Amino acid sequence: MEIEAVEKEAIEKLSKISNVQELESFRIEFLGKKGKITGLMKNLKNLPPEERPAYGKRVNELREKIEKLFEEKRQQIQRILEQEKMEKMRIDVTVPGARRKLGHSHPVLKVMEEIERIFVSMGFDVVEGPEIETTWHNFDALNTPEWHPARDEHDSFYITDDLLLRTHTSPVQIRTMLERKPPIAIISPGKVYRRDYDATHLPMFHQVEGLHVDRDLSVAHLKFTLEEFARRMFGEGAKVRLRPSFFPFTEPSFEVDVYLSGYGWLEILGAGMVDPNVFLNVGYDPEEWTGYAFGMGVERIAMLKYGITDIREFVRNDVRFLSSY
């Protein structure tokens, strides 16, 4: 009988199938719309009416049987494929794991933290303040006259007539003196802003400024502090010299140079004795208190420490550069 022949052929072929492609070909050949089992139903029209029910039932039973065997074979092949995949993904727990890439400290941050550690070890407190300042804190209280070029819009970033991005961290010293009674010894690290951009200047850079107020302080105390800083930052061979200069908030004022082997004398910061007018602006009696102040650009110190010639390298986000320090 034709039904038995199709059944035998289907079971025999199904038993030999070993992959998904062969299984799909089998499905089309026997279970598809034009497959052999569907073709058996076309014989109904050639049978006597009384035989058709039994024949149709037999064909449907065959389809159900082959579909069941087909599904079992599909699951069998699926299990084999999953097992093969697991074998390929087998983990050798004895193999050393891949090292995770960790972040790297920016050279400016490293130098700023080193500066802070040096001055903290010398008894200075670290104090921070707002980056948006009033003109009074940024200029007036620091004895900066109206005609001074630093107050010009071409040099500073003004937000309103009375507010600007601070041009130095000295306003932190003003705020601290208004809040505390002397003696005080502080450093104020942070970002500052000026309208300048070239190989040695950035519109946003970092400063650390220091202030020490006590009775009977002199230039000798200032020089000792800066010599100690230079020695710890640049090594035992570092020497310091003071050159006369002018800053509105100190009198006398100095440019400070450091001598480094292989480089000679290099300017690193500005300093001086606090001007009596600054003390008067914060309510300190200049007849009783004296003080010295200093300020340095962190990028400048980093350039000297690491031999960097272009300050713009610090903001170019070149991983090769950043990971070198």
Swiss-Prot record:
It is found in: Cytoplasm. It comes from the Bacteria. Its EC number is 6.1.1.20. Keywords: Aminoacyl-tRNA synthetase, ATP-binding, Cytoplasm, Ligase, Magnesium, Metal-binding, Nucleotide-binding, Protein biosynthesis. InterPro entries: aa-tRNA-synth_II (IPR006195), aa-tRNA-synth_II/BPL/LPL (IPR045864), Phe-tRNA-synth_IIc_asu (IPR004529), Phe-tRNA_ligase_II_N (IPR004188), Phe_tRNA_ligase_alpha1_bac (IPR022911), Phenylalanyl-tRNA_Synthase (IPR002319), tRNA-bd_arm (IPR010978). It catalyses: tRNA(Phe) + L-phenylalanine + ATP = L-phenylalanyl-tRNA(Phe) + AMP + diphosphate + H(+). Pfam families: Phe_tRNA-synt_N (PF02912), tRNA-synt_2d (PF01409). GO terms for molecular function: ATP binding; magnesium ion binding; phenylalanine-tRNA ligase activity; tRNA binding. Its cofactor is Mg(2+). It is an enzyme of class 6 (ligase). One of its GO terms (cellular component) is cytoplasm. Mg(2+) binds at residue 251. Coiled coil: none annotated. One of its GO terms (biological process) is phenylalanyl-tRNA aminoacylation. Binds 2 magnesium ions per tetramer. Its main location: cytoplasm. Gene3D superfamilies: Bira Bifunctional Protein, Domain 2. Tetramer of two alpha and two beta subunits. Belongs to the class-II aminoacyl-tRNA synthetase family. Phe-tRNA synthetase alpha subunit type 1 subfamily. This is Phenylalanine--tRNA ligase alpha subunit.
